[in-house]
UniProtKB/Swiss-Prot annotation:
Composition-biased stretches (Low complexity): 337-348
Function: May be involved in signal transduction as a component of a multimeric receptor complex.
Principal location listed in the UniProt entry: membrane
Segments for region (Disordered): 218-259, 331-363, 469-491, 505-633
Biological process terms in GO annotation: cell surface receptor signaling pathway
Bilayer topology: Multi-pass membrane protein
Pfam families: CD20
Organism: Homo sapiens (Human)
Locations listed in the record: Membrane
Membrane-crossing segments per the record: 50-70, 76-96, 110-130, 141-161
GO cellular component, one term: plasma membrane
Biased composition (Basic and acidic residues): 224-234, 469-478, 580-601
Name of the protein in its database record: Membrane-spanning 4-domains subfamily A member 14
Listed Polar residues bias regions: 519-535, 550-563, 619-632
Length: 679
């Protein structure tokens, strides 16, 4: 597709025979308006809201300064503070509308703010209307001291200016008014019968979208009925509401008499290339041109199925030789008669005069392009397009930028984008048959009709193949995208799994190492403390046991002498008082031992507490150690008491059997051997 900025003029040359009716349609470009521009443009809406907020703030400041400078009464709008808080709401709404990012929450917020801003605007209008009630009689007259001038100007700007802008924008530019020019060249028979041509054109607006479908040029006369046009060649026409209509005044056709030549209708129009995205529905209102020729013969029906327009590149006249003008066309059969077959062509910036059709040789090419060679041009002159009234035997020159017609003219041609290869198909056989007199028509019409059907079938098949190729390419792209997305999802899942696994391993290693270190630390702290406590207890008990043993031995040695003397003197009846005295001594010794053990346990507790506070580095093991120490401290006096009690019992047993020692010495020796004094 070409760029739309270039304006070109193009011409269709349609060669037909007399007694024919040509039905053609002419499209128009849709007119842009302010509403279409603002539709779907949130940035423009936000910018207008911000500008209106600034205007309202400006008016509010003017009224406030007027009150300060001239001490006049403020209107109700300014007293309510609408110029300030209303402007703030408008600015916030405009900012959010401009910075609207495609998210659901933000879209809902922008919609809510727009609703709030509309309500604020309605309140501002009501305040402005109510403020007129509190003004004096000068409010009805133009006064620079009151609010009337400012409010009126504001209403004028807000209500009248946008309507003027829309009206001006909806008026089409003069360049958009397409012009139709017809040049009728009549082919006269040998009788030189007079003919008259009359054209009627109905203009209108057409809104359409360019598609791959191809529309034929249909010519309908009146008597032989109507031939069937294939559905593939018809363009689907959808109705849409008209915005406006224009009637184009037809130019008076010029009749140029050329013996042994065809009657050509040249359609000269100026087009602007239109994009596929801007056009959505198609309405083609065909402009009818009826040529009523006064002849006795009945009109014959002719159908010219032209599947696509011819496309030529811009060729300057300097590059073209005078006797070899390349023109893109179709393969055409040479007939014995002087009249050439009907053809539809699109020329490109060619200026040629006096082009007789006798010296034209046609060549059939595989690319469906035909180059007409050896066209002898005599007396080549540069004539203007406006000089159509002067009859001459030469074709008028034409300033034709031809590349625009592929994208704009739907009158008798279909439009294809550059992505699809355009096939140029014509049926010269039908044209020759219809242009020849009845006597010269060949008999082999059936094979020619079969060839025509085959060509149309091949053309339709090529179109279907092109569309299927496009669909296949789209499917392949979709598959590639889906495979890429699947691979990316798998990669992301694998990375996430590896990361989670590594994090789990690290966490487990850290936990296990921490637990192991804590266990080792607790064991390391507990083991030396337990050993130290055991050693302290043993060290504390061992001297006590030695002291108790020594005291017991001393008591025994001391008591043996008086006991022996007493036993000798009082052998018979003095054992009981001696037992009482001995029991008193034993009780005294027990009390002394208990006091000493209590003092020692208290000293040990006072010494163990600071030592344990110094040795415990962590607060986690302090409670455990304190409990162990308390249990051990509680066990120490119990052990001491048990040892002392055992020693007392042994001592009592020894004293009890002392009397027996004197009576039977061998028996006491055996008892002493069995029960020795051990701490």
């Amino acid at each position: 597709m070409e760029s739309t900025s270039q304006d070109r003029r193009a011409t269709h040359v349609i060669t037909i025979k007399p007694n024919e009716t040509v039905l053609t349609a002419f499209p128009y470009r849709p007119h842009s308006s302010l509403l279409d521009f603002l539709k779907g443009e949130p940035r423009v809406l936000g910018a207008t809201q911000i500008l209106l907020a600034l205007i309202i703030v400006g008016f509010g400041t003017i009224f406030a300064l007027n009150y300060i400078g001239f001490s006049q009464r403020l209107p109700l709008v300014v007293l309510t503070g609408y110029p300030f808080w209303g402007a703030l709401i408008f600015i916030l709404t405009g900012y959010l509308t401009v910075t609207d990012k495609k998210s659901k929450l933000l879209g809902q917020g922008v919609t809510g703010m727009n609703v709030i801003s509309s309500l604020v605007a309605i309140t501002g209008i009501t305040f402005t209307i109510l403020s007129y009630r509190h003004q004096d009689k000068y409010c009805q007259m133009p006064s620079f001291e009151e609010i009337c001038v400012f409010s009126r100007t504001l209403f004028i700007v807000l209500f009248f200016l946008p309507s003027d802008v829309t009206q001006n924008s909806e008026q089409p530019a003069p360049e958009e008014n397409d012009q139709l020019q017809f040049v009728l060249q009549e082919e006269f028979s040998s009788d030189d019968s007079t003919t008259n041509a009359q054209s009627v054109i109905f203009g209108g607006y057409a809104f359409f979208k360019l598609t791959l479908s191809r529309s034929p040029l249909v010519s309908q006369p009146g008597n032989k009925g109507r031939e069937f046009v294939p559905d593939e060649q018809k363009q689907s026409i959808l109705p849409s509401p008209k915005f406006s209509e224009e009637e184009i005044e037809p130019l008076p056709p010029t009749l140029e008499k050329k013996p042994s030549e065809n009657m050509s209708i040249q359609l000269d129009s100026t087009f602007k290339q239109m994009k596929d995205e801007d056009l959505q529905s198609a309405i083609v209102q065909p402009s009818q041109m009826q040529t009523k020729l006064l002849q006795d013969q009945a009109a014959s029906l002719q159908v010219f199925p032209s599947h696509s327009a011819l496309k030529l590149e811009d060729i300057s006249p300097e590059d073209l030789p005078s006797q070899a003008l390349p023109v893109e066309g179709l393969s055409e059969q040479t007939m014995p008669s002087k009249s050439t077959s009907s053809h539809v062509k699109q020329s490109s910036n060619l200026t040629a005069n006096d082009l007789p059709p006798q010296g034209i040789l046609s060549q059939d090419t595989s690319s469906q392009d035909m180059l007409f060679h050896d066209m002898t041009s005599q007396d080549m002159q540069s004539l203007d397009m406006l000089s159509q009234d002067t009859p001459s035997h030469a074709m008028p020159p034409q300033d034709i930028p031809s590349q625009d017609m592929l994208s704009q003219a739907l009158s008798a041609h279909a439009i294809l984008p550059e992505a699809s290869t355009s096939h140029i198909v014509q049926f010269p056989e039908i044209q020759h048959l219809l242009q020849q007199p009845p006597d010269l028509q060949p008999e082999n019409t059936e094979p020619q009709n079969q060839q025509i059907l085959q060509m149309s079938y091949q053309d339709i098949r090529s179109e279907v193949m092109e569309e299927t190729k496009e669909w296949k390419s789209e499917e392949e792209l979709h598959r590639r995208k889906s495979s890429r997305r699947h691979s990316l999802n798998q990669q992301t899942k694998a990375l996430q799994y590896l990361r989670r696994h590594s994090l789990d391993v690290q966490a487990k290693g850290q936990k296990s190492s921490k637990r192991h270190s804590l266990d080792q630390q607790s064991k390391g702290w507990q083991s030396p403390k337990q050993k130290s406590l055991d050693q302290q207890i043993k060290d504390w008990l061992s001297p006590k046991r030695h002291s108790v043993d020594k005291q017991a031995q001393l008591n025994q040695t001391k008591e043996q002498l008086p006991d022996q003397q007493a036993e000798d003197q009082q052998a018979k009846g003095e054992q009981y008082p001696e037992g009482q005295s001995k029991d008193g001594q034993v009780k005294d010794q027990q009390t002394d031992k208990e006091q000493n053990s209590k003092k020692q346990t208290q000293d040990q507790q006072t010494e163990d507490q600071p030592a344990q506070e110094k040795k415990s580095p962590k607060g986690q093991f302090q409670n455990v150690q304190a409990e162990g120490q308390q249990a051990q401290v509680e066990k120490v006096p119990k052990l001491l008491c048990q040892d002392s009690e055992s020693q007392i019992q042994q001592y009592q047993f020894w004293q009890f059997h002392k009397g027996n020692l004197q009576a039977g010495q061998p028996r006491t020796v055996n008892l002493l051997a069995k029960n020795p004094l051990t701490g």
